[in-house]
């Protein structure tokens, strides 16, 4: 190996480990401090509305609603769902395009640090960051940040801003049905309104409420009381 190549790889390694160290320090800080913004907020085409609320102040059915709708294996996996990823890759091989298959942890990583769109580079970074979040933050913090940074409408981020916008009250006072109606927005928040649901979305809300009952009020208790 020539001196030039050794110099290039040495410089690349130096930059990489410095970047990873800075990333780890950032995640460590955000374990305790609410993120002042996110990459998705910075890229928003709309005025941003977001109000932080502690997960301890939310009714237990609000986090349960998003877990029931988005990631029922959230308490069990370590950031990524291998079965869902395998299924998505098989569908991609069949010509169906690259689908989501993202856990709540992956969605949190994406919303916080990455960019919209679906490609293998972003999905790879998303998975790597998800595992890092699980190791550094833990489940409760991941769920808390997700509930505060997920998009629920055009420029509306987090359940507190969403609750005030759609229901004119704090997320602290959301009912089971209202929580399920907010959760159903998550796959396509800019095209859905919890006060003007299509027949399909009303079915999804009913399904979500049924899943919440089946999972039970204690499903997330080991996480929320940690």
UniProtKB/Swiss-Prot annotation:
Its EC number is 2.4.99.28. The keyword Hydrolase does not apply. It is a single-pass membrane protein. One of its GO terms (molecular function) is pentosyltransferase activity. GO terms for biological process: cell wall organization; peptidoglycan biosynthetic process; regulation of cell shape. Keywords: Cell inner membrane, Cell membrane, Cell shape, Cell wall biogenesis/degradation, Glycosyltransferase, Membrane, Peptidoglycan synthesis, Transferase, Transmembrane, Transmembrane helix. It is found in: Cell inner membrane. It is an enzyme of class 2 (transferase). Pathway: Cell wall biogenesis; peptidoglycan biosynthesis. Pfam families: Transgly. The keyword Transferase applies. Coiled coil: none annotated. The chain crosses the membrane at residues 8-28. It catalyses: [GlcNAc-(1->4)-Mur2Ac(oyl-L-Ala-gamma-D-Glu-L-Lys-D-Ala-D-Ala)](n)-di-trans,octa-cis-undecaprenyl diphosphate + beta-D-GlcNAc-(1->4)-Mur2Ac(oyl-L-Ala-gamma-D-Glu-L-Lys-D-Ala-D-Ala)-di-trans,octa-cis-undecaprenyl diphosphate = [GlcNAc-(1->4)-Mur2Ac(oyl-L-Ala-gamma-D-Glu-L-Lys-D-Ala-D-Ala)](n+1)-di-trans,octa-cis-undecaprenyl diphosphate + di-trans,octa-cis-undecaprenyl diphosphate + H(+). It comes from the Bacteria. Its main location: membrane. NCBIfam families: mono_pep_trsgly. Belongs to the glycosyltransferase 51 family. Peptidoglycan polymerase that catalyzes glycan chain elongation from lipid-linked precursors. This is Biosynthetic peptidoglycan transglycosylase. It comes from Shewanella frigidimarina (strain NCIMB 400). The gene is mtgA.
